Amino acid sequence: MTAGGSRRLPRWLTVLLALMCAVGCGSPAPQQRRVTVWAMGREGAVIAQLLPEFTKLHPDIEVRIQQLPWTAAHQKLLTAFAGEATPDLCQLGNTWIPEFVALKALEPLDQSLARSTAVQASDYFPGIWDTNIIGGTLYGVPWYIDTRLLFYRRDLLAQAGFAEPPRTWEEWSRMLAAIKALVGPERYGVLLPLNEFDTLLVLAIQQPEPLLRADGRYGNFRSAGFHRALGFYREIFQRQWAPPVDSTQISNVWNELGRGYFSFYISGPWNIGEFTRRLPPEQQHTWMTAPMPGPDGPGASIAGGASLVIFRRSRHKAEAWLLLEFLSSPQIQKRFYQLTGDLPPRRSTWRAPELAGNLYARAFREQLERVKPQPKVPEWERIVSDMRLMAERVVHGDLSVEEGAADLDRDVDAVLQKRRWLLARGVTP
């Protein structure tokens, strides 16, 4: 007992208490930041495989992924927007971007882009980058590209007397006629399923006139260019170069191309893998890809695919942008291509041997320099559906080209009535 009645603590206990205080009373551990990501389909499953490297770079950021089926994604996003429950970062189909911009749901990305050294607009194919610019503002960064071009039987083309694929509509017409003469009445030159809009849309965007006029207020389907596209589309069926069937009547497009039921097929990059897997080894040398022919030379195609967007209500925009930059890097895009077969939107990624050395992908690389965005109005998916229905009636002879174009213009003008009303009052729809 010391003076004053207090008891001195043993030295070992004093040291222990000091250590405990140093551990327990020091600076708190950094708070874990959380980023929620929504992605669709196969991409939603694959993205998790890319994240370990991001976690190493940013250990204080937790990434939570929700995978959505494409069939339910659009409605779930709208429901989440209405309930103020949108994710931080999201994969968004390029034709959906105008709709969510109209809802004021997306965060403008121009300032983030200006500060970024990882995302360089000049490295992206111009047509796909442009799909994300609405009213002069950037709302997304392309994640992967989906476009359309020719898959064809080069052996049958050679038998018909042609050494190279077509570069113009006129050349393509001559090839289709020659193939039809070669294969007879039970087979065809090309398959253009009537329940798919892609082919007519590609032919239409190859024209100099836009599909909508007056800043998307009215249809422009009475234009000479659309008449030309629709007329050529109808001619392919009239001359029996294509069977008037839809995709449900073709049990297996890979086998049908393999057996020569048709020699040309317009499709997207996923079919590189499908034809490679499904055709037997002895037929692998018989097929190839080629860019779309155009009215007077190599033609444009659609700039489809998906982009990465940040929702305006996100509380973690800086962290979401870091993840967006990571997923947009050429190295990660290369790995993403290896896992999914999705085509990267950056030119620099295409220097990777997996892409540069892929004979079937080379035509896509050339085509990507000539892709065009579809009209940037929220109503576009409804419009393109109406276009497909009209085209089917023209093919079956229920409407002439002139009647079909006029009917479509009237229908589209009705669809765009609300847009005109809003624009007239200074509201951006």
Model-derived regions, located:
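Glycine-centered hinge/linker elements that transmit conformational signals in sensory
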Residues: L176-A178, D215-S247, M292
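Hinge/lid segment of periplasmic solute-binding proteins
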Residues: N94-L149, L201, Q284-A290, E354-L359, ...
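Extracytoplasmic/periplasmic solute-binding protein
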Residues: I134-W143, R148, S173-G219, F262
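C-terminal lobe and pocket-closing loops
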Residues: P269-Q284, P295-L389, L423-P429
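Short, well-ordered beta-strand elements
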Residues: Q31-R42, I61-Q66, D88-L89, Y188, ...
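Extracytoplasmic "Venus flytrap"/periplasmic binding protein-like
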Residues: E53-Y124, I133, A158-A160, E164-R167, ...
